[in-house]
Amino acid sequence: LALHLIKLSVGTTGVDDLDAWHHDPRAQGADGLPRHVTRMWPRREAEVLDGGSIYWVIQGLVQCRQRILRLDEVIGGDGIRRCAIVLEPGLIRTATAQKRPFQGWRYLDPRDAPPDLGRAHRNEESLPPALSAALAEIGVI
């Protein structure tokens, strides 16, 4: 079973904002694929690369995911080895789920991952974060 990662998308206001960032050349590697560079390399790499995704927490709510294609080594200008999480282009919207702030990324068990939204809902506008949070808090979403 694939193992997922979960990560806060700091400074992002919504799914469309994250998507726009991933189209910016600064968020892409030489191959044109979006990536997220982090200091920590997943020790459970084989499980993550067996179909895992990164679930994005935007303003306190898990709202979307991206499939992880590979992990690339990146050496920063400071000589420190980092991990570039190379992502499949395009975001897959998920059911929203509240998530408290945390640092870095965490493993996410597939049983705890919010389900993808059905095809009928994928192109719908996201609810405002405050409304989504309020609905999630009372268990509506």
Per-range role (PLM):
Residues 2-3, 20-23, 27-28, 96, ...:
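Intrinsically disordered, low-complexity regulatory segments
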Residues 18, 30, 35, 45, ...:
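Positively charged, polar, low-complexity stretches
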Residues 104-109, 115-141:
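Well-ordered alpha/beta subsegment
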Residues 1-20:
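Short, extreme N-terminal leader segments that mark the start of a protein/domain
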Residues 67-114:
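Aromatic- and Lys/Arg-enriched surface recognition patch
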Residues 24-65:
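Short, well-structured hydrophobic secondary-structure segments
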Residues 4, 50, 81-83:
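A generic structural signal for short beta-strands and their flanking turns/coil linkers
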Residues 18, 51, 64-70, 127, ...:
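Amphipathic alpha-helical interface surfaces
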